[in-house]
């Protein structure tokens, strides 16, 4: 069997990650991913809850007063079937921020109640020369039939569609998959939860795989409003500056393999950022910094405003080729994020007083 992580990640956890990556979780259709989380986390958590909107929350210490919420979004970008033409081709709209030019000629998976139906997005030599650029409305999905009647027996309008690209290893400890944004984040918060539990974390921990981040960010708002945490740790991916088309001047120099990324944004708590850096220094994890002039465009933006306001910190995983058929990440960054967040969790006392949280920041 393939071995992904060469050092501290156990084989059972690698299987967990691969099953997460294999699940289809187009925004609004996250059930496959929820089932994977429940399978692996129910034996380890005090409680596992799935709310009406679909957020799946693993709880450690539900009766403890001081609560830390960790979130990462389970949903992914994709397409939705709208109608079928007379030739049996599926017409679609986007669900989330897809890159249209990456779809033509690719194999896709259409999810139905009877199981997946496979097809290909029609393409031809001059398709990419279309005036004004490609749009989702230009897509026609060929599922191998030649009439509307045949297609409608297999697929109904509203069916979610994803690119049929899976996990594989690259060189140098890197790996590729569809939907590392943000299935990697989900994996990280669950692994940090397990490490913190083993180390005797004294506060209440709520590790939430949220829904809808790619479309509405409603899942994060629901979870934050229900848990009412004292603070929140959001884990998502971020662009690296070390690949084509990216510029370090836009938000900072971020490299694959360079370690977890902390965000300097108006919605991120300065104090929590500093605490994260102190934790990183204690355990020898190198961190990187990115800057945002306003919002972070992650679940942190919704959580920050929930209730009476929730102090929030954003920890990001460097990622190349975000929202493309094959996104690339580095195992060292994943391990660094897990270690950093676990250290952060166990550094808090049961009441939050260990670090003096809640006192005015003197800086």
Q: What residue ranges belong to the model's regions?
A:
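N-terminal hydrophobic/helix-forming segments and targeting peptides
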Residues: 5-363
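Extracellular interaction modules
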Residues: 1-3
């Amino acid at each position: 069997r393939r071995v992904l992580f060469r050092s501290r990640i156990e084989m059972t956890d690698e299987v967990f990650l691969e099953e997460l990556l294999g699940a289809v979780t187009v925004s609004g259709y996250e059930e496959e991913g929820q089932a994977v989380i429940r399978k692996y986390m129910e034996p380890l958590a005090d409680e596992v809850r799935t709310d009406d909107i679909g957020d799946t929350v693993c709880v450690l210490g539900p009766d403890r007063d001081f609560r830390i919420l960790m979130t990462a979004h389970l949903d992914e970008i994709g397409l939705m079937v709208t109608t079928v033409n007379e030739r049996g081709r599926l017409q679609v709209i986007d669900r989330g921020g897809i890159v249209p030019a990456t779809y033509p000629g690719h194999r896709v998976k259409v999810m139905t109640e009877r199981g997946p139906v496979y097809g290909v997005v029609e393409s031809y030599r001059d398709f990419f020369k279309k005036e004004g650029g490609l749009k989702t409305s230009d897509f026609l999905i060929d599922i191998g039939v030649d009439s509307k009647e045949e297609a409608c027996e297999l697929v109904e309008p509203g069916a979610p569609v994803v690119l049929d690209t899976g996990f594989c290893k690259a060189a140098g400890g890197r790996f590729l998959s569809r939907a590392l944004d943000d299935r990697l984040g989900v994996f990280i918060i669950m692994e940090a939860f397990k490490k913190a539990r083993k180390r005797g974390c004294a506060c209440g921990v709520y590790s939430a795989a949220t829904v809808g981040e790619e479309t509405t960010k409603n899942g994060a708002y629901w979870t934050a409003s229900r848990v009412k945490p004292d603070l929140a740790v959001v884990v998502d991916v971020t662009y690296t500056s070390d690949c084509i088309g990216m510029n370090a001047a836009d938000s900072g120099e971020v490299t694959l393999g360079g370690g977890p990324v902390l965000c300097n944004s108006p919605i991120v708590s300065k104090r929590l950022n500093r605490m994260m850096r102190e934790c990183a220094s204690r355990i020898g994890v190198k961190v990187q910094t990115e800057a945002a002039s306003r919002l972070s465009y992650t679940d942190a933006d919704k959580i920050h405003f929930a209730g009476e306001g929730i102090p929030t910190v954003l920890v990001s995983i460097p990622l190349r080729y975000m929202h493309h058929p094959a996104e690339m990440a580095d195992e060292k960054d994943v391990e660094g994020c897990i270690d950093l967040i676990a250290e952060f969790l166990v550094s808090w006392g049961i009441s939050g007083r260990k670090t003096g949280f809640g006192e005015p920041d003197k800086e």
